[in-house]
Amino acid sequence: MKPVSCVGLLVLLVGVLVTVKGSILFQSPKVLIVSLIRNKEHTLPYFFSYLEDQEYPKDRISLWFRSDHNEDRSIDIIKAWLKRVTKKYHSVDFGYRSDAAKRYDEKSSTHWSEDRFADVIRLKQEALDKGRKMWADFVLFLDADVLLTNPNTIAKLVSLNLPIVAPMLLSDGLYSNFWCGMTADYYYHRTDEYKEILNYEKTGEFPVPMVHSAVMVNINVQQSLNLSFDKRRLPPGHYTGPVDDIIIFAMSANYSSIPMYISNSASYGYILVPLEQGDPLEKDLEQLTNTKVYIINEHGAINLKEDLKHFVPKVPKDKMGVSHIYMINLERRPERRNKMFNNFDELGLDVEFFPAVDGRQLSDDKLRDIGVKFLPGYADPYHKRPMTMGEIGCFLSHYYIWEKMVAMNQEEVLVLEDDIRFEPYFKRRVAQVLDDARRIGGWDLIYFGRKRLQEDDEKWVVGSETLVVAGYSYWTLGYLISLQGAKKLLEEKPLEKLVPVDEYIPIMFNNHPNESWVNHFKNRNLVAWSAAPLLLYPTHYTGDDGYISDTEDSARIDNFNKVLNDTSDSSAEKKGDKEQLSSKTLMDSTISRDEHELSVANRKSEL
């Protein structure tokens, strides 16, 4: 090859793409993507949709897939996707076997037998060797239940140019695709640093003893020749651990002085927690639902290619056993409405859109026509200001639902706002709460999501492990209300002494700190409980990117005179702020899920 002259310099280049006006552009490094696939019909349509949308030149990507021992349509989905995209990629190597559902020594499809480990080790080693022979620059080992929602993931990992690096992936718990500690006998060791990295308390690329499930290997590193999944290739006498591909690979890196890194300098995507032996497939389906709900919360919708949609069954919808479900949403907020209905589609919720009363459309005359009068002396506890038009519209929206459920004689109604995030296993946990509530009886309202405003521990409802007696709370993110509860809230004629709805409800269950307000309401006999842990949280808090409040940030009223410029103290706490409770209280009120300390054998999702 002749030297290339560039601005008076002689440079010998390999892989030059083009020279334009003295500048030289290089082709992107070659990447081999390796995936071992078994019984992933439920994840593959999403796995492929997000993989296809990676913004990295496809003619610089080769695909290497293997699949066997399936009990579902995994092979059909792989074939369908490859039929459409193969020509886009540099090369495709797909091998599969249509053999028995289980190996002879497997007890179930989630059992990691000796033969299964041997097959995975053999195939991964074959793929690594293939990458070397084809002169790939990088090999990306990618599990089929990893959803790379960040389209720049591959480009980012390549640009880091590290020997071994994994993008940190999130799950519906504390599980991720890296370890921060490993014991002398090769087991997971919990460390404080793990949560610091997982929770983005520190960001960057950090050396760790173990990465798995999505691992980029730089083949250009000289020492990478020593990397192996096969313990027979390790230095004699060094390794005495289990026959496990990810452990062996990590130790081969260790023996070769090749550091492994986890990267959390970007948000990359999600991973499902591997099933343990004996776990039913339904558990994985629930995990996938949780993950899709997370993705919708972050991105608004799920990426699913048109030709893969027929592989995804529609989720049947129901009302979870209650009379009706309403979702309050301003008609001028279609993006929130669409996001919520995307959630409902994934969760299987039959929900009616209830158009919210828009504070922007309210006027002094309209309020007089409705019969609205304000509680004498009311001022927001933090801003010391009257109600905003948005808060009035919010109250009226809830009020009209209470009226409607009484008119239609609806026994139990779930009321949802449009800025909520569903907790994992939402429907299953709602069923548990409903079972307890109906068995115990006597309730009027049950918070599913709220902001607690008292430090004192709330007492458990006698006979329940899912319900507490509600203390003073903000927010009406979501609550279950009985017909009797709706009647109680209406009979007090709240429009004649209006306060925000999330002040009115605590007043009515007689747990409000402002006695001067409370004394205006006589029948404070609402029985209010709360789900514990909570089932709903806000999508955003004050100060978060994307935080919008249609109640706090609207015009306020002052004896029916609009004040268009709210000059209240911006440093005061807003209702959109997170709870500021003691750490003990927070621990008691949230799901505590440690890292899934699964056996090494079950930290798997490949063949």
Swiss-Prot record:
Spans annotated as Disordered: 566-607
Superkingdom field: Eukaryota
Subcellular localization(s) per the UniProt record: Endoplasmic reticulum lumen
Gene3D superfamilies referenced in this protein's UniProt entry, alphabetically: Spore Coat Polysaccharide Biosynthesis Protein SpsA, Chain A
UniProt EC number: 2.-.-.-
Record: glycosylation sites: N226, N254, N514, N565
Molecular function, one GO term: procollagen galactosyltransferase activity
One GO CC annotation: endoplasmic reticulum lumen
Protein name as catalogued: Glycosyltransferase 25 family member
High-level lineage: Eukaryota, Metazoa, Ecdysozoa, Arthropoda, Hexapoda
